[in-house]
């Protein structure tokens, strides 16, 4: 199947999942995870109607920006971001989804202040409490919100999570539901620089379960572009 056909099929599945959950399909965004896909593939996905593109690596982001690969859609950064590469991302993307530490939060705020902008971000939550993954612990999110007013050049737009890898349908629903309840808890309070209207969770293998649990953005790569060939990955 072509990229356009894959996008159409994912949209169909998203609609089915949304309607089954009593939700409006238009309230859920499709973010194309473009890691290891070239500028032409990205352009095809945008032409097929994805809502935004998500890039995992600073090197790829920089190269594709130079090629105008993202024209026609917002670009987000969705991979682990090192503090020494913040300058290459802040102001270049509409949303940084993967803010996983207070140190990174502060670095983004400083760079945004230097540029005279407000950078939109999501806080990444290590919802499965996995030692191999970065992210804030769920119990640290609400206390962190009390300090967000100190960072005047960032705006928290919501939360992002990558649950543990599972090959069993529905197994990650408990993590998705925990994320949803955490986002509700934040919305019920009033914090400076916080507008929690985005809940980014769900990928190629589990986006239907994420939608059933309240996701407002799914990040899909393999189901759009096909399996990645890591043997040919020269950027590792």
Annotate the PLM regions.
Residues 233-236:
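Mg2+-dependent phosphoryl-transfer enzymes with acidic/Ser/Thr/Gly-rich catalytic loops
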